[in-house]
Amino acid sequence: MKVSTHNHWDPLEEIVVGIADHARVPTVDRSTMSMSYTNHPMDLIKPLEGEYPKWLIDEANEDLQGLSDVLSKAGIKVHRPIPIDHSKEFSTPEWKTTGWYTWCPRDLLLPMDNLVIETPSACRARQYETRAYRDIMLEAIADGVEWIAAPKPTLPDEGYQFDDIEGKPSLLNLEPIFDAPNCVRLGKDILFQISNTGNHWGLKWLQNVLEHRGYRIHPAEHIYSYGHFDSTIVPLRPGLVLLNSSRVTAENCPKVFEKWDKIWFDDCVAQGSKIPGGVA
């Protein structure tokens, strides 16, 4: 597998498409709540622990296979992860948890040029998720790709706050943490989102790793704190960006887009859920 990527708009040549096998709601703890359920009470989420319904996993796998087939027919090389049992419990001296899922390869692997960074997730349940991509990454190394991993975070309970989830992220700034989609890649410019999945220590670590390689890392704060930037800012080509008008305004729009043409769209609308409690 060869990696050479600099942005979000170049023609696609290779891709990793995830799988839904063994997907579940993991052990519900402060990291799980911070990652995905910040605006839900824990007593609503806790009973959902366990594997997702079979119909949901089957439908998700059918959709993912359909996507893989479409991409393959378009001449794109598609890689798939190996199934791993997310029900297996693992631990550190401070906590224990089960795993979560393997349908979001883009969350934990950040490609920059021919470098792939394994990112330090804010969620305990995702600390060993990249095992599913090990064979793909070994193939990439054999083809000359440089693979590095950020320091594994300790993720203590005190690393999260839920007293003011509207005013600031639930993730605190105790150690380097970020997901790959906290980063918007614009060639040598990278927009770094401060949110529930990325903090200032994560920003500093990435600056230390990438700035001597010629990259410029631009922090983006007070725009959207619930997770990733892909429902907020999407660069379409050089000089044209798609922006969520319910979050991005003329006042808080990142300066890197100051001279770009902008397309504004209304906020994303949830389509509902068949999961108990309406939890996505």
Please identify what each model-predicted range represents:
Residues 1-280:
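The feature marks the mature, well-folded catalytic cores of soluble enzymes
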